[in-house]
Amino acid sequence: MAYKFDPNDQTTNVLEDKVFISVETIRKNIGDLGMKTIQVMAYEGISEEKELIRAVSDVILFSTGQLVSDDSIRRSIQSLRSNGLIETKEINTGVRRFNILWLTTNGLLFVGKNFRRRPAESECEGFIREHASVHHGYLIKDVKKILEDKKIYDEISTERKENFIRIGDGKACIPDIVCKSGDESFYYEVECGTHKQRDFNEKCSKLTVLTREIIIVGQNRKIVGGILKRQVETWIDKEWEALNKKDVEVYLTTISDLKNDKWTYCYDMYTSEPRCNCPIVWEKKGGES
């Protein structure tokens, strides 16, 4: 049962069934390690469970010289959840599966009472603010990490403010990922397969103002080979004449294929069917590979 804290009461909390319990009881329930875990989570805005475990371990090692096992920290996280202070959810980006955590309303109030400070904005909150959803945010994060590991681009941005580009006629385009190599820019759209066709068409058409190479990354084969492939082909059929004049090419891929240097589907405006499993030739500006 989740606790409902009274922010004006420094000693007691109220349960949903009106049974009173002290904040001190919750402190005892979660123990010293639980207190440290929720403090690190709140202060550093960490949302991924593995990152939180590593951060708590580092903080304790630095401050006390003691080693704490990952399993012990996992148990403290479970204690925070069972006491209604955090919630968890599994995320699957197509290249990794992991748990994310966030403070409940009760958890926020508990942090405020115990540590007398407002928690930092969590990674989850940042993704909700910046992107369509938490899941979309983590997909973008993992695509960015893959591109960083390729060491091809000089700069990679996923910030909406930085990626805002005016394209004329009072319109703007905000690519999910903007990569720069020398004087060239490359744009990646990361799709969950939730856009309506009209919105998908508009986004892709805006990108053709910026580039003739449209790159779209999806979570898995089901989404890419089903929803996104159908949407890409519908858009191409509708805009073929304009796309043909611009010599547009479309690269549609799963995140795992991108990691493995492969486009799942490649479209040009000269053939009726896409090429499949096309090797990606990563090149820096000036042809340095």
Where are these regions (language model features)?
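Interdomain/boundary linker segments immediately adjacent to catalytic/signaling cores
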Residues: Y43, R54, S63-D142
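Non-catalytic C-terminal interaction segments of nucleic acid-processing enzymes
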Residues: A2, V14, V19-I26, G34, ...
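Short, Lys/Arg-enriched N-terminal segment that forms or immediately precedes the first helix
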Residues: D9-K28, P119-F127
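Conserved beta-strand segments of the P-loop GTPase G domain that flank and frequently precede/overlap
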Residues: Y188-E191, I215-Q219
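Mg2+/Mn2+-dependent nuclease catalytic core
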Residues: G193-R212
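Short amphipathic alpha-helical interface segments
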Residues: R27-S63
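Short beta-alpha junction loops
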Residues: G107, V217-V224
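Active-site metal-binding core of divalent-cation-utilizing nuclease and nuclease-like domains
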Residues: E148-D199
